[in-house]
Structures are given as C-alpha cells and as structure tokens.
Amino acid sequence: RDPNGYWCNWTGSSYVNPLAGVIGTVYDIKEAPNGDIYICGIFDNVSNKGEIVANTKGIARWSKANQQWEAVGDPDGVNTSIAVIYVMAFDANGDLYVGGYFTDLADIANADYFAKFTVSTGLWSAVGSGIDYSVQAIAISPEGTVYIGGTFTSAGGNTDCKYIAYFDKTANDWRPLSTGLNSFVYALKFAPDGRLLIGGHFTNAVGTGGDFICWWDGSAFGSFENLGATGLSDYVRSIDINKNGTIIIGGIFTNAGGDSNANKIAAWRG
C-alpha cells in the first residue's frame, strides 16, 4: 500500500507510488494483452497526481501508452451507484469479464452481478439474461467457455445454477453444472488436464465427499477424497497451480488432509 491509497508498484527492491491514489480496497488485478493494467474493488475513484479521474468507481485501467489511470468504458465508466467488483478475467479475444455485487452495470438491463467489457469498442454489455446475486469467481476454459461461481442461486432463470454455472454461447444463456452445489463458490481454476477446480463453502459435492473443494470434469463433480485424501476442516477462498502442476489452496481451514501444519494454505501434489 502506498501512502495515498491501496495501490503501488514493486520494483524488485522497493514500493513505488504510480502517481496515483486508490482510496478503498482493491480485490483483483489483471493485465490486458496490450499491457494495460486493470484493477477492481470497492472504491469511489482513482487519481492521477492528485487529480480525481471521473467515472472510476469500482474499476479503473492504468494505460501503458498514456501512463495514467483511465475510466473503463468511455465516457461514463460503469455508471452505477453501487459498484463492488470482486473479480475479472480476460478471454482469448482480449475482452474483459467482471463479477461482483452490482445491478444494471452501465445502465444496461440484465448486467446484474456479471458483465462483459469489449475493449475494442469501449462498451459494456450483459451476458445472458441475468444472475440473482453476487459473482465471486470467474474461469474461462481453453475452448473459451465462461464459468462463474458465487453466492447466486439462479442464473438465466435456471434454479439448478446454484452457486456455479457456465455460459452456453449457442443458447446465449446460462447452464448448470449438474444441479449445482449447496453453498457459496469463491474460487475457480482450470487444471492442465482440463478439470475445473472449485473451492468454496459447500459440502458433499460428491456424495459424502467434496467438502470445500472439488472438481468438474465436464460431466460430473469429483473429489480429492476419491483419490484417497482426507478432507479440509473449513472453506477455501483461493486456488492456484504452479508450473510443476502442484495445486495450491488458501482459505479459512486449519487442517488439510489430517495435517494441522496445513493451516490456511496447503498443496496437493497427487
């Protein structure tokens, strides 16, 4: 954190204020294919050298070319009184998807809790026919299918889309993964073998297994208990995979696989 806000650069030896302040909380940072940096969170605006940048509520872009903060979606940004954006993801075309707690983003009907920003046109759009509550996680498959997780219990009017769903481009609407899960999803990550790893507050994703973490193989949920593992003591907030294929999770748990040293962070090397 820099002295003027909640954003700074690490040069390798020190933190540097990038001529800006972000008064609030930054939840996610993503780099666009062109090198621009996008940040999102819960903040009213950002500033360049002390000058407030209009229409940067909840999301802003650091322009690599102009070396300054800019609104996302000229000229009005997200243009909503409530803008809490938790998560972002770029697709293969360089377009941006955002999830959070907001309704009618940029005054667009059905742009509720999830929306798309087409970088080439600078326009926001709805994705499908709407979601009923907040989106906390986004993952895009190698084939370009968008998956979301969160606290919602319906997407596109489908009540089987409980806490997790994917977007069917052909039907132009949301579809369920089986009949969904029984509680919140906070993390989604595709593994190298194509499985979608899912972390959250749910239990019993697979019979009596799959508490707090499971996977989706394209047709069914699976669990690490199926591989002989002991489960977690509490929920998962984040999932990542290192270059060696090791799955790393973080969360509220104090025990993973029976190991009390796996306290809030653990690795799976199976």
Residue ranges, per PLM feature:
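Extracytoplasmic surface signature
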Residues: R1-G270
